[in-house]
């Protein structure tokens, strides 16, 4: 009994250490370097793209754009109060989970900033892994999507998620992980949210 009790904390600590090391693994580092090199050589440095990507990154702060889209979707359906209320509550729960509990498991440093930035940008102090913007974007897209409008929601999600690597607030792997987490959580939350905000239309 005591032996089991003594080994359990060690196993949990080993698991936690392995999870914490994942973002710093050589394979992840190579992926991040390749993605950043691609962005630097072929994407960054264009004024129009700077405006789009910095704007998208700012729009994703505190899920502002997703709350606005939830209000618009609720107005369109005739369920403004329930759609806005349930979606906002779901986004708050997702943010608490990802930006609180999940990020605490990793504590990854953010990419080194290269100043001056072409446009102003809010710089968070939380862990870099995973990207909260990417997670909330794909979470909200999963909840709000409809058969006719899903391409618009996911296009917005991809743009906001990608913008975080573009502006060097996140590593590319942070964005991929955040998008995956948000997509899974969104699919799990969708029946709960849509059960009270309107019919769940198939894609």
Predicted regions and their residues:
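Alpha-helical transmembrane segments of integral membrane proteins
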Residues: 53, 82-90, 149-152, 173-177
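Membrane-interface elements of multi-pass transporters and channels
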Residues: 42, 46, 75, 104-113, ...
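Interfacial segments of alpha-helical transmembrane regions
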Residues: 72-97
